[in-house]
């Protein structure tokens, strides 16, 4: 796929990508940082002058207490997610401040979850959190990357369609 799509149109996601992190950054790809270690690694590399700070779009994968907003709908329940940068414990604030100090702008937010119900309420909560973070930290975002747990591929009575997910998410993002 990489041969057919320019790097700046590929969002590079996921944990454990340290080895590829700088390659993607140097090629101008969209890079979602998954944890505080990846944030620090990229900031240190930029501070050392290995790559320019404006070289690519950087996003942050964020986790938060979704269960509090959507009780009994998440697969993680009340457990802290092992993926993403935690909003509640201050890690997110540090993950936004550190790149700023290194001259790296945060261009995006990545929110990904797994659900038991696949309801639109979960995705409304994710989109609402994206808006809250954008406003709270004064971010100028180019993208919000949301995934996980969509019901799709077939029409099933009582399950949301892709159009319903899109309407729900866009409605929250426009607020």
Residue ranges and their predicted role:
Residues 1-143:
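Active-site-proximal beta-alpha core segment in soluble small-molecule metabolic enzymes
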